[in-house]
Amino acid sequence: MFNIRNGDYMLRKLENEIVKECAPTLAGIKMANLFNYRFISEDEFNSEIKTANMNLNEKGVYIEVLRKTDMSSLIYVYRPSMLFKAVNNDDVWNILSSYGYIERSIQACINTLKERLMTQPCFPHEIGLFLGYPVEDVKEFIFNKGQNCKCCGVWKVYYNEQESVRTFARFKKCSEVYQKVFI
């Protein structure tokens, strides 16, 4: 999938993790995924991210490191075309702007999210919008402080329970297929 050189273990480890954690995004059925990734060498990690990005960008998928500590990173894998539509949706933008997002460009929104991840004591709840979660569910999650959901899967569901359960099943099946094919 990524066209890596044989024997490049660290890059292969990152790519396997991307397939494992982000299959629905890779397949184009989900806007984005987010996962934690541990690394040994920051220089090697930066090189791995650069190479993976080069390989995925031509497929319409991009990688951003949202937060990095000594040996761990929070990696955001996304489809810019889908994120563009999301941030230009007025319901999504109303929530984002209430949290201090001031520009609708993809990079400006990602940069604001990075800043909020570094400065907020809690994980920013609007991140669900960056992952393609339904706006109504994100609003209710924030309002209910994560409580009182109808069901829980990829996200906590407050509306359209049956549709969400079907979506979760599609994501799970996609992940299973991608892991069989690519790992």
Predicted segments with their positions:
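Short, surface-exposed ligand-recognition loops at beta-strand->loop->(often short) alpha-helix junctions
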Residues: 39-47
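Hydrophobic/aromatic-rich, well-ordered segments within soluble, folded domains that form packed cores
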Residues: 124-149
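Intrinsic low-complexity, intrinsically disordered or marginally ordered coil/linker segments
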Residues: 2-6, 97, 113, 161, ...
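Short, extreme N-terminal leader segments that mark the start of a protein/domain
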Residues: 1-37
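Short, flexible, solvent-exposed loop/turn segments with mixed acidic/basic and small polar residues
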Residues: 22-28, 63-67, 114-119
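Long, compositionally biased
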Residues: 154-183
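A glycine-rich, hydrophobic loop/mini-helix early in the fold
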Residues: 48-105
